[in-house]
């Protein structure tokens, strides 16, 4: 990662300074971007599972963050038994404070360090652990319905009206927080062949959604409303001043639309999980792709604003190719990272590698943004364009605030969720996903107000006569040099015998008249010094000076 950060300079345009003056925040931000893992949006937790268990299967292990008084329902939907079999089904509900505690249970079962007959509550230290057992459950080939599973203690504390609805409830949580639910199925006849299709559901006060995902669902709903308000506000401004809309304002409209679409799709996915308990993988992948496009376009928007596109420069030239290439690179890796996280989980190797690459690309974005912004502000200061300079000064202050907020937040998340031995702050986990969307929404509203359509919109537009770009200045110089060469040839005329005719005052007047008629006034300032420096003109000037000096003596 360090080598990747050091190689960033080779990918950018050459400058005398790699960083703008007085930019310690940029160095700190780049270091944190290289060393801190990228923020990973967690896949929402399910609320309904359908599992197949046979005579060779081990215990079923389920993990979820649940509210207090969440009902856990367990039932056998279908079964197949080759002969008469008596089942003993035992389930254990364990509450634990640390989210990363007991994360290796599946590995222990695979290595046979834990057996099916193990007392899991004893292994899990018995604290906040409840065990329930249903014995002598008959199953044979003639059975039509598998015996229902229940917890007598829970049935006794329910009233009669809710008793029928609660027959499948096998456990109920006593606290808000992380829980592990383990189901162990044993038979007396170990040689019997059998197959069970088990259904498990966890329904809390807000439906199937987990306690850690419920605040995130509310956040996406609020942000969707916020982006709708952004869109209405921007459309209103654009409709009032549609004749003066700048090119940069179309980019802002596209970012607002994609942000609204992204939040709407994520909210619908979380709402679907809350209602059904199941996640629609296709909808989740679509949401991740929309998010990747929106994040890419948002970064490109900040870069082209920093470069002064449409404000200081009419076009970006070859720099635009680098910006688009960097954006496409980010889009590809962001899309792959999102899809692989949905399919393979957050710990998949491809996800980890993509996170590292995205961190490096983000550091390049930060580098590019600050260098371009410093160059744009320097140009505006030299041109003494106070209106545009004030605009970019406010934008710079917004980016500095975003960098400071990112540094503080990355330090907090690293301490709380990544290096902590006991990850107990489950109520704040949604902030790890929501912060970056909220921070960009603040940057976007600042950009909207700074570049909003208005009656004075053209104050911020590029003016060819005032805001000439560097490329046009170079083209002007080349054209001027070509013109002066022609003027030098015009200064000495040949006669028929091949000898040069010396310049006289009449020739000088003719040359001056030709210059005034054929060369624009903006070019004479560059062309005239070359004309004056010719030998003939030096002689003419000296003769005129002598005449004027002699006339003064006579007077």
Curated annotation (Swiss-Prot):
Compartment annotation: Golgi apparatus membrane
Organism: Homo sapiens (Human)
Classification via PANTHER family: LUNG SEVEN TRANSMEMBRANE RECEPTOR, TRANSMEMBRANE PROTEIN 87B
GO BP, sorted A to Z: retrograde transport, endosome to Golgi
Taxonomic placement: Eukaryota, Metazoa, Chordata, Craniata, Vertebrata
Annotated function: May be involved in retrograde transport from endosomes to the trans-Golgi network (TGN).
Phosphoserine: residues bearing it: 469, 494, 496, 534
Regions of this protein lying in the Lumenal compartment: 43-214, 269-299, 344-350, 418-429
One Gene Ontology term, aspect cellular component: Golgi cisterna membrane
Protein name: Transmembrane protein 87B
Family: Belongs to the LU7TM family. TMEM87 subfamily.
Signal sequence range: 1-42
Membrane topology of this protein: Multi-pass membrane protein
Transmembrane segments: 215-235, 248-268, 300-320, 323-343, 351-371, 397-417, 430-450
């Amino acid at each position: 990662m360090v080598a990747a950060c050091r190689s960033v300079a080779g990918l950018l345009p050459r400058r005398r300074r790699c960083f703008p003056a007085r930019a310690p925040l940029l160095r700190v931000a780049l270091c944190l971007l290289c060393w801190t893992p990228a923020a990973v949006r967690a896949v929402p937790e399910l609320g309904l599972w359908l599992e197949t268990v046979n005579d060779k299967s081990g215990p079923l292990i389920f993990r979820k963050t649940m509210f207090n008084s969440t009902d856990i329902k367990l039932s056998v939907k279908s079964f197949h038994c080759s002969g008469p079999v008596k089942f003993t089904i035992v389930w254990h509900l364990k509450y634990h404070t640390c989210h990363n505690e007991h994360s290796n249970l599946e590995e222990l079962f695979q290595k046979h360090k834990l057996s099916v007959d193990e007392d899991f509550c004893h292994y899990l230290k018995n604290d906040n652990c409840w065990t329930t057992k249903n014995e002598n459950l008959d199953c044979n080939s003639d059975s039509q319905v598998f015996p229902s599973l229940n917890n007598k203690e829970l049935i006794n504390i329910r009233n009669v009206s809710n008793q029928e609805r609660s027959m499948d409830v096998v456990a109920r949580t006593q606290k808000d927080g992380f829980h592990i639910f383990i189901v162990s199925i044993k038979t007396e006849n170990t040689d019997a062949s059998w197959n069970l299709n088990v259904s498990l559901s966890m329904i809390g006060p807000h439906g199937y959604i987990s306690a850690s995902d419920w605040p995130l669902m509310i956040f996406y709903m609020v942000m969707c409303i916020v982006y709708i308000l952004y869109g209405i506000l921007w459309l209103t401004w654009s409709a009032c001043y549609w004749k003066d809309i700048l090119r940069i304002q179309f980019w802002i409209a596209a970012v607002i639309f994609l942000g609204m679409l992204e939040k709407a799709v994520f909210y619908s996915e979380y709402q679907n999980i809350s209602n059904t308990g199941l996640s629609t993988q296709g909808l989740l992948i679509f949401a991740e792709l929309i998010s990747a496009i929106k994040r890419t376009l948002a970064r490109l928007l900040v870069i082209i604003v920093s470069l002064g596109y449409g404000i200081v420069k009419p076009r970006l030239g070859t720099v635009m190719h680098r910006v688009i290439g960097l954006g496409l690179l980010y889009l590809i890796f962001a899309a792959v990272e999102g899809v692989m996280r949905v399919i393979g989980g957050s710990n998949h190797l491809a996800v980890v590698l993509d996170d590292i690459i995205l961190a490096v690309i983000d550091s390049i974005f930060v580098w590019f943004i600050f260098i371009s912004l410093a160059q744009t502000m320097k140009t505006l200061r030299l041109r003494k364009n106070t209106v545009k300079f004030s605009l970019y000064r406010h934008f710079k202050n917004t980016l500095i605030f975003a960098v400071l907020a990112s540094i503080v937040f990355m330090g907090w998340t690293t301490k709380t969720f990544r290096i902590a031995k006991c990850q107990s702050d489950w109520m704040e986990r949604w902030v790890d996903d929501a912060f970056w969307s909220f921070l960009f929404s603040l940057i976007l509203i600042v950009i909207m107000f700074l570049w909003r359509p208005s009656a004075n919109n053209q104050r911020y537009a590029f003016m060819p006569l005032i805001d000439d770009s560097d490329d046009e200045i170079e083209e002007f110089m080349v054209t001027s040099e070509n013109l002066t060469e022609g003027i030098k040839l015009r200064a000495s005329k040949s006669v028929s015998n091949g000898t040069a005719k010396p310049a006289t005052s009449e020739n000088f007047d003719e040359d001056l008249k030709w210059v005034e008629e054929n060369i624009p006034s903006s070019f004479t300032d560059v062309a005239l010094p070359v004309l004056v420096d010719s030998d003939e003109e030096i002689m003419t000037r000296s003769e005129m000076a002598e005449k004027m000096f002699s006339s003064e003596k006579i007077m």
